[in-house]
Regions:
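Helix-loop-helix module between adjacent transmembrane segments
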Residues: 20, 78-170, 229, 309-319, ...
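Loop-to-transmembrane helix boundary motifs in multi-pass membrane proteins
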Residues: 114-121, 326-371
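Hydrophobic, small-residue-rich membrane helices and short re-entrant helix-turn-helix hairpins
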Residues: 103-112, 173-181, 236-265, 282-291, ...
Length: 504
C-alpha cells in the first residue's frame, strides 16, 4: 500500500485502540474482572451477553474461513461453515440443564465434583490449547491486511493489535470484554451491510442461492461433519461457557439461542463474499476470499474489510484473554485448594501478557488458520456425551477418560497421519475424511461414555442402592424457583465479596 493508504490503515488501528481503552472500565470489582458484574455486583445484562457471544464467535478467522468455503463450494460451503453456530443454542441448553438440575456453578467445579481432578486437568489442557489457537489465528488475519504473511508490516500490525487488546483487558477483565464486545458487534453489523451492498448487487439472488452442488463432494460432507462437531464443539470454548454462568439460567439460555441464530445468519451472509468469487471464477490461491474480493472492489472496500477483521478479531481476542485470566487465576487454583498470596487479578494479567507473546509465535511462523477450528473440533468429540448425557446414565471417571481420549487420539492421528484413518472416509469429496472420522469417532466416543455408566448403573441396581446421580427432581426445582424469587424480591442475591474493587 502507498504512504497515504498506509497512514489511513495504521491510523485506524491506533484510533481503534484508543476507543477500546476509553470504552473499557478502568476500575472493576473482582466479580467484574472475572465474572462480568457491574460495580453493584449485578450480573451483566442478558442482551449484552447476547451481543458478546454473537461477536466473540464471529472470529476473524471464522469469517475468513466462511468466505473461503463460499469461494470453494458456493452457498453450500457458506451454510456448512455456519453450522458451527448452531452449537451455541445446544451448549446453552446443556449448561441450563447442568445449572438447574445439578447446581453447576462453573465447568471446572462441575467436573471436579463429578469426574475428579484428572478429568479437570484433561479438560483444562484442551481449553488452554483452544485459547492459544485463538491468539495467533486471529492476529494473523489482521496482519494480512497490512502486509504479506511473514513480512514486517504483517508482524508489526499483528503484535500492535495484540498489545492493544491485552492492554484494555488488563484494565477491565471480563466486564471490559463484554462492554467492548457490544461496540464491536455494532461496528461489525454496520460494515457487513455496507460490504454486502457492494457485493450482492453484482449477481441475482437466484445465482447466490443456487451456487454450488448439494452432493457429498460439493460440500455436503462438510455440512454433516460440522453438524456432528456441534454436539461437542461449544464445550471446550471457555469464552462461550464462561458466559453460561454469569446471569440467571433462563436469561442465559435465551441469550445463547438468539446469539447462535444471529451468528448462523451472519456467517451465511458473510460467505456471500466468497460465493461472489465462486460465481466470478476468482482464484484465491495463496490468499483468502475476503482479501481477493475486497481488493477487486477498490481501496475503500478493502479498508472496510480490514475494519471488519479488526473488530471481529478484537472481540474474540479480548474474550480469550478474560477467560484465560479466570481459568488460571480463579478456576485452577480453586480445584487445587490453593489460595494464591498474589492478587488474583495480577495473576490473570501475567498470564494474559505471556499468552499474548507466546500465542503469536505460530503467527510469525506462518501456521494455517483453518487448523485452529477443524483439528480442535475433531479432538474434543468426547466432550459431547460427557455434558449432554450427564445424569442420563451414572457418571463415571472411566467413562469420562475413555470418551475424552478416544476423541483426542483420533483427532491427533487424523492430524499427523490422516491416511491412517482413510478406511473411515465417507464419499470422495474434499471432506470425506473429515466426515468419516467425525461420524465414526462420535459413535465410538458416545459408546465409550455410555457403556461404563450403564455397567455401574446396573451394579447399583443389583446392590439395591438408590441412585443419587440423577440430579434434582421437578419438585426440588419448583421449591428452588420459589426461593430464588423470594431472594430476588428481598435483594439478597448480591455477593459482598464480589463488590471489593481490584484497585485498578
Amino acid at each position: 500500500m502507498d504512504s497515504t493508504t498506509g497512514i489511513f490503515f495504521w491510523g485506524f488501528l491506533i484510533v481503534y485502540g484508543i476507543v477500546m481503552f476509553l470504552l473499557s472500565p478502568k476500575t472493576v470489582s473482582l466479580g467484574g474482572f472475572f465474572k462480568g458484574e457491574d460495580k453493584l455486583g449485578r450480573a451483566a445484562n442478558p442482551w449484552m451477553i447476547t451481543a458478546s457471544i454473537f461477536i466473540a464467535w464471529i472470529f476473524a478467522k471464522s469469517v475468513t474461513n466462511a468466505a473461503n468455503m463460499g469461494a470453494n463450494f458456493g452457498i453450500v460451503g457458506g451454510i456448512g461453515y455456519a453450522m458451527y453456530w448452531l452449537c451455541i443454542p445446544l451448549t446453552g441448553w446443556a449448561l441450563y440443564r447442568l445449572r438447574r438440575k445439578f447446581k453447576a456453578t462453573g465447568m471446572i467445579s462441575f467436573l471436579t465434583e463429578h469426574y475428579g481432578i484428572a478429568a479437570v486437568f484433561c479438560f483444562s489442557a484442551a481449553i488452554l490449547v483452544r485459547l492459544f489457537n485463538e491468539v495467533w489465528s486471529n492476529t494473523s488475519v489482521v496482519g494480512a491486511y497490512y502486509g504479506a504473511s511473514g513480512s514486517a508490516p504483517f508482524i508489526i500490525a499483528a503484535l500492535l493489535f495484540t498489545a492493544i487488546t491485552v492492554g484494555y483487558c488488563c484494565w477491565g477483565g471480563m466486564r471490559g470484554s463484554i462492554i467492548t464486545d457490544v461496540a464491536q458487534a455494532i461496528l461489525f453489523a454496520v460494515l457487513l451491510v455496507a460490504v454486502l451492498a457492494w457485493v450482492v448487487p453484482q449477481h441475482s439472488l437466484a445465482d447466490f442461492a443456487t451456487s454450488g452442488t448439494w452432493t457429498l463432494g460439493g460440500g455436503v460432507d462438510f455440512i454433516i461433519g460440522a453438524g456432528l462437531q456441534c454436539l461437542s464443539y461449544g464445550f471446550h470454548d471457555a469464552v462461550l461457557t464462561d458466559r453460561g454462568f454469569i446471569c440467571e439460567e433462563k436469561k442465559m439460555l435465551k441469550s445463547f439461542t438468539v446469539a447462535g441464530l444471529l451468528g448462523f445468519v451472519a456467517i451465511v451472509l458473510f460467505s456471500l463474499i466468497g460465493v461472489h468469487a465462486y460465481l466470478d471464477g476468482m482464484s484465491i490461491a495463496g490468499s483468502s476470499a475476503p482479501v481477493v474480493v475486497a481488493q477487486s472492489l477498490g481501496i475503500m472496500a478493502f479498508f472496510m474489510m480490514a475494519v471488519i477483521m479488526i473488530a471481529t478479531a478484537g472481540s474474540t481476542l479480548d474474550s480469550t484473554f478474560s477467560s484465560l485470566a479466570k481459568l488460571t487465576a480463579r478456576d485452577l487454583p480453586g480445584i487445587l485448594g490453593h489460595t494464591p498470596k498474589m492478587n488474583p487479578r495480577i495473576i490473570g494479567i501475567i498470564f494474559m501478557i505471556v499468552f499474548g507473546i507466546v500465542g503469536n509465535l505460530p503467527m510469525i511462523m506462518g501456521a494455517d488458520i483453518i487448523t485452529a477450528t477443524t483439528i480442535s473440533g475433531t479432538m474434543i468429540m468426547g466432550l459431547g456425551p460427557i455434558f449432554l448425557l450427564h445424569g442420563v446414565v451414572k457418571p463415571t471417571k472411566v467413562g469420562f477418560q475413555l470418551a475424552f481420549w478416544v476423541g483426542m487420539v483420533l483427532g491427533i492421528v487424523d492430524t499427523v497421519a490422516p491416511a491412517a484413518l482413510g478406511f473411515m472416509d465417507i464419499g470422495g469429496g474434499s471432506y470425506a475424511n473429515f466426515l468419516g472420522v467425525n461420524l465414526w469417532g462420535a459413535v465410538a466416543c458416545w459408546a465409550a461414555y455410555l457403556i461404563p455408566g450403564l455397567v455401574a448403573q446396573a451394579a447399583e441396581k443389583r446392590a439395591g442402592i438408590e441412585p443419587t446421580w440423577k440430579g434434582l427432581s421437578r419438585e426440588d426445582l419448583a421449591r428452588l424457583d420459589a426461593d430464588a424469587k423470594r431472594r430476588e424480591q428481598q435483594g439478597l442475591d448480591l455477593d459482598p465479596e464480589d463488590l471489593a474493587t481490584t484497585g485498578a
